[in-house]
């Protein structure tokens, strides 16, 4: 398969360029970065693209890719329900084209979200702490937002988190994502980390994942690239490719 990389000179993008070059069954067709024309992808006969760019440009990238029948594996964050609806609308006019958008491609991170969803209904309280390098554009992270939504979905019909806080500084209790507090830390020296905390009477449970290097995203991204054609339309999250349900 001929694979292009968008955001090829970024920290994650350059890691993906090296990964595609090292894969015997993949051919690097184009390296595209800020200021480069997207036509480099079509000129190179690109069949699938890995996009690790920026929330400000990713939608324009996807519109171009879908209209040209190029499959997309997207690790760029900032996808709202409205943005996903727009991608579905584009895909409706391009049957057979596939887009996979995932907040995290580290297998361990995907598993931690799955474990959190399973655990959520057994505990009274749940909170999420995500920790990233200070250059990250969005807060909270897409992974933390999705984790909180999965927990909230699993807890439907249960009482809300017990919390007697009546006075606090703005933001002290984190962002509210469907009733789940999410706290974002930005600190030099970090890459990508998340801890999910559960509590009930007499016990707590912590589920933590640490990406210590950006190479942690490679296995998940390459899995998505190799299987993207099996999932026409829009897929959100890596879970369907891991048969997690």
From Swiss-Prot:
- Family matches, as Pfam families: DapB_C, DapB_N
| Residues at the catalytic site | 132, 136
Catalytic activity, EC: 1.17.1.8
Residues where (S)-2,3,4,5-tetrahydrodipicolinate binds: 133, 142-143
Signal peptide position in this chain? none
Q: Which GO terms describe its biological process?
A: diaminopimelate biosynthetic process; lysine biosynthetic process via diaminopimelate
Family as reported in the entry's similarity comment: Belongs to the DapB family.
Which PANTHER family does its entry note? 4-HYDROXY-TETRAHYDRODIPICOLINATE REDUCTASE 1, CHLOROPLASTIC-RELATED, DIHYDRODIPICOLINATE REDUCTASE
Name of the protein this chain belongs to: 4-hydroxy-tetrahydrodipicolinate reductase
